[in-house]
């Protein structure tokens, strides 16, 4: 047993996760009724979600409390990259619609009872209210906008505190980071449970009826990850971006694919940024912020599903209108939050541009939930890996200039 544990610990985390994926799929096909196996996945995601708000709060406050006047970060560049990357992804989805137009079986889709935003104004209102949420409530409800805002406020306020107080905050950040490392080391078992749960509940053939929609969604997201993002990175860095792109997809995207939550993947991304040697003054803020506003995958989902509904209803859409849709979906995607399935509930906002009733729009959302097993996983992988990619690109572009 000791030899096995020793060999297991020497194996890289990615290989251990791959083993967990294979075992989870096999168990899901052979013994789907042993649902207790899926509890491993629920506990893993629950653990990440539980510690992530505290981690963000502690690390951001600690980082800002240690900064001095004149220190530089790349936050302005990172935010511009986040917004431009999301818009580029939305525009890519529009182009894919013209190349591969698809329609939906709206009558067969089950409507969801979840409440969707009534417009872009409501999305902005929610974001503003999240900023001034009670800090304790923000931590307990994983409101990352609120957590981030209050962490920044406390961090700046503590810049004038005594060194003893700053050291206490630094210790809290270190302890929280260690707990996160322990949880991440359990990823192979957690992902085993997540894969088992997906296969045992849905089987491998449940998505056959929606194969074309899945192909367009996944194909567009793949194009963004392997073509659009590398182009942006190359323009900014002036060198081959693919080693960095593949590193982000491997170390961040794979984990995010199975957790289906950008929020739960924050600890993984923070560790990757540290491994890449990035400036903590930047990434301790940009990563949790990215889990909320950097939503390239969400923009793709919103545009593809909305334009599929438009095609189904026979509504003619010129490119100028589709361009406006890209702007709307970019803004709306910023409110998707880092929660599994969040982008689907913003589809009615985009559908409203074309006069599509809320009832029909919610049927489109129902289709989204049907294909969500794959769509949401790919969307989260793109969103989360891009958080690290653009943070690294912003810093490396500054290195090029200096």
UniProtKB/Swiss-Prot annotation:
InterPro entries: Na-dicarboxylate_symporter (IPR001991), Na:dicarbo_symporter_sf (IPR036458), Ser_Thr_transp_SstT (IPR023025). Pfam families: SDF (PF00375). Keywords: Amino-acid transport, Cell membrane, Membrane, Symport, Transmembrane, Transmembrane helix, Transport. It catalyses: L-serine(in) + Na(+)(in) = L-serine(out) + Na(+)(out); L-threonine(in) + Na(+)(in) = L-threonine(out) + Na(+)(out). Its main location: membrane. One of its GO terms (cellular component) is plasma membrane. It is a multi-pass membrane protein. GO terms for molecular function: neutral L-amino acid:sodium symporter activity. Involved in the import of serine and threonine into the cell, with the concomitant import of sodium (symport system). This is Serine/threonine transporter SstT. The lineage of its organism: Bacteria, Bacillati, Bacillota, Bacilli, Lactobacillales.
């Amino acid at each position: 047993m000791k030899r096995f544990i020793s060999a297991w610990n020497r194996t890289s985390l990615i290989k251990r996760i791959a083993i967990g994926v294979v075992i989870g799929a096999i168990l899901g096909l052979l013994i789907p009724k042993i649902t207790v196996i899926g509890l491993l996945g629920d506990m893993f995601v629950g653990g990440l979600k539980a510690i992530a708000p505290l981690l963000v709060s502690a690390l951001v406050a600690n980082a800002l409390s240690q900064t001095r006047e004149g220190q530089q970060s790349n936050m302005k560049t990172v935010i511009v990259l986040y917004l431009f990357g999301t818009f580029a992804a939305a525009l890519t989805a529009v182009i894919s619609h013209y190349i591969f137009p698809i329609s939906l079986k709206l009558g067969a889709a089950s409507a969801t009872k979840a409440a969707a935003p009534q417009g872009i104004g409501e999305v902005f209102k929610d974001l503003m209210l999240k900023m001034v949420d009670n800090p304790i409530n923000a931590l307990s409800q994983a409101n990352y906008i609120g957590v981030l805002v209050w962490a920044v406020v406390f961090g700046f306020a503590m810049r004038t505190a005594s060194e003893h107080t700053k050291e206490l905050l630094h210790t809290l950040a270190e302890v929280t980071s260690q707990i996160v490392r322990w949880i991440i080391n359990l990823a192979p078992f957690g992902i085993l449970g997540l894969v088992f749960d997906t296969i045992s509940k849905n089987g491998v053939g449940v998505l056959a009826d929606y194969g074309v929609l899945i192909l367009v969604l996944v194909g567009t997201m793949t194009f963004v990850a392997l073509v659009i993002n590398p182009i942006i990175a190359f323009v900014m860095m002036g060198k081959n971006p693919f080693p960095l792109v593949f590193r982000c997809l491997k170390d961040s995207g794979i984990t995010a694919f199975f957790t289906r939550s950008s929020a739960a993947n924050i600890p993984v991304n923070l560790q990757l940024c540290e491994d890449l040697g990035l400036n903590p003054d930047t990434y301790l803020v940009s990563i949790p912020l990215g889990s909320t506003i950097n939503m390239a995958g969400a923009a793709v989902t919103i545009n593809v599903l909305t334009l599929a509904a438009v095609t189904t209803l026979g509504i003619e859409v010129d490119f100028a209108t589709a361009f406006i849709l890209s702007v709307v979906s970019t803004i709306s995607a910023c409110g998707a939050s880092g929660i599994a399935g969040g982008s689907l509930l913003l589809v009615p906002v985009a559908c409203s541009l074309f006069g599509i009733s809320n009832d029909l729009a919610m049927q489109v959302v129902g289709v989204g939930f049907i294909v969500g097993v794959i769509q949401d996983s790919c969307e989260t992988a793109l969103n989360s890996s891009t958080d690290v990619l653009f943070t690294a690109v912003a810093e490396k572009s500054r290195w090029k200039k200096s």
